[in-house]
C-alpha cells in the first residue's frame, strides 16, 4: 500500500510517501517568517502553507519515484493545531483524494507523535508486546500516555499549564535568545553547569510538599518560568551574558528532570518496561541523555524517534495511517477540521 501523508498543523509544511511501512520520501519545509515575532503567527503560517503545499507534495512524490495514480490512500492532519494551518493541508489532501478517487484518512497529530518512534518498523511489525509509556513533548503539548498492546491508549498525565517546549522558548526569550529558543538552549547547555542555579521542579519529589506530587503524573512549568523571570530581574545584564551557558543548562535541567521523573514513575506505576519519547522536544540532547541514563538505572527500554521524525513531519502522518488501516480502520472520503484539544480522546485508535 502506498500512502501520501500531509502535515500542516503549525509551522512546518510537510509531505511524505510511505510504501508498506517504509518511508520513501519525507519533505519538510520549516517556516522562518515567525522569528521576528517571537512565536508562530497563525495567519502567516496559513499563508505559507498555502504557498508551499503543492510544491512540497510534488517533490515528495517525485523523490519517492512514483506517479500520483500509484497512490492508494491520502492521509492528513485533522487536528489539534492552528485551524487555518490545518485547513490548508486538510482541504488540499481531501481535494487530491477526490481527484484521484482514492480514500482519505484524517489523522490526530498527537497520535502520530505517540507512534513516531516506530516509523519504518512497518505497519505489521510488532510494537512492544506489553504496551509502553509514551512521553509526547513539544511546544504545544506535554503528556504521558499508556499505550496498550491493542494500540489503544489512555492519557495518564498532562500539563496543567504550559507545555515543556513553550517553557524552553519563553525562558529562552527572557535570557535574550531568538525564537525558537529550545534548540539554542540545548546547544548552550552542552558547555554549561546545570547546578549553577536550582530552578523549581513542580509536582516532583523535589517539590517542597511531598503530598503535592505523590502519584501525580501531571506536569506544571508556569512556576518554573516565573522563577526564571524573578531571578533574572535580580541579575545585571552583564552577569546574565557572561553566565549564559550555565543559565541555559540550569533551565534545561529543571525541565528535563521533571520529564524524566514523571516518565519513570508512569512506567513503574503501570508495570511496563518500555518508554518512548516523541515530539519536537524529544530531539533535545539533554533529555535524550538523561532519559537514557534513568531508563538504564531502572531496567527500562527507551525508544527514541530518529531526530528527523521528532519535529512535525508527514512521515508520522502516513505511518500512523498505515497502522490504523492495518488494524481495521475504515478510510473516509470527507472529514472536517478538529483544531481543539478534545480531539485527543482518552482511548482512541480506531
UniProtKB/Swiss-Prot annotation:
Recorded GO CC terms: cytoplasm
Note on cofactor: Binds 1 Fe(2+) ion per subunit.
Location(s), subcellular: Cytoplasm
SUPFAM superfamilies reported in the protein's UniProt record: Actin-like ATPase domain
A single GO BP: tRNA threonylcarbamoyladenosine modification
Positions with a binding annotation for Fe cation: 109, 113, 312
Keyword annotations: Acyltransferase, Cytoplasm, Iron, Metal-binding, Transferase, tRNA processing
Required co-factors: Fe(2+)
Record's catalysed reaction(s): L-threonylcarbamoyladenylate + adenosine(37) in tRNA = N(6)-L-threonylcarbamoyladenosine(37) in tRNA + AMP + H(+)
Entry binding sites for substrate: 136-140, 169, 182, 186, 284
Entry EC no(s): 2.3.1.234
GO terms, molecular function: iron ion binding; N(6)-L-threonylcarbamoyladenine synthase activity
Domain of life per record: Bacteria
Protein family (similarity comment): Belongs to the KAE1 / TsaD family.
Role summary: Required for the formation of a threonylcarbamoyl group on adenosine at position 37 (t(6)A37) in tRNAs that read codons beginning with adenine. Is involved in the transfer of the threonylcarbamoyl moiety of threonylcarbamoyl-AMP (TC-AMP) to the N6 group of A37, together with TsaE and TsaB. TsaD likely plays a direct catalytic role in this reaction.
Official protein name in the record: tRNA N6-adenosine threonylcarbamoyltransferase
Originating organism: Chlorobium chlorochromatii (strain CaD3)
Gene (UniProt): tsaD
